[in-house]
A protein has these predicted regions:
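Glycine-rich catalytic cores of cysteine/serine-nucleophile enzymes that process amide/ester linkages
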Residues: 3-65
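Intrinsically disordered, low-complexity sequence elements enriched in Ser/Thr/Gly/Pro
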Residues: 15-16, 74, 132, 136
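Aromatic/basic micro-patches that form nucleic-acid/chromatin recognition or nuclease catalytic surfaces
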Residues: 58-85, 89
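Activation targets extended, charge/polar-rich intrinsically disordered C-terminal tails
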Residues: 79-140
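Feature targets compositionally biased, intrinsically disordered low-complexity regions
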Residues: 55-56, 68, 128, 138
Length: 140
């Protein structure tokens, strides 16, 4: 049952996150085994789940997915693929990071720096009604 629940979630387009060493990286799952995220290379990129886990040279163990998704959020993420420094400025781990990208995809608005004190999970609750996360079992 968990397997079918995760599959159902992944068919719905959703926010994903991973942890390693106390740090978190977030992105938008857009279907077809693809995640869009704002990378440390200052570029909005598409990658597969395995590459997402290895961002920054670390090897996180799990990807967590929100149990509610949105096609509008996925469209916003897709529209930014290829954007870089000219469109978004340089990547900054404190203020111009993957969380900011996800918040902007969720809200449809430019994220002001003072909003970054909140966790993207809070925005998932507000914009998607998502308050539950599951580990993505990529083996099934």
């Amino acid at each position: 049952m968990v397997c079918s629940l995760i599959l159902w979630i992944l068919l719905r387009l959703t926010v994903v996150r991973r942890y390693h060493g106390g740090l978190e990286h977030t992105g938008i799952y857009v279907g077809s085994n693809q995640i869009i995220h704002w990378s440390e290379n200052s570029k909005v990129e598409t990658c597969n789940p395995e590459a997402f886990l290895q961002m920054g040279g670390d090897l996180a163990l799990s990807i967590y997915v929100s149990c509610i998704g949105s096609s509008q959020v996925a469209l916003r993420a897709r529209a930014q693929v290829g954007h870089g420094i000219d469109e978004r400025g340089p990547y900054d781990p404190l203020v111009n990071n993957s969380h900011r990208f996800v918040i902007e995809c969720l809200s449809g608005q430019e994220c002001k720096e003072d909003l970054l004190v909140k966790d993207p999970i809070e925005y998932c609750k507000v914009y998607l009604g998502a308050d539950n996360w599951r580990v993505w079992d990529r083996g099934n």
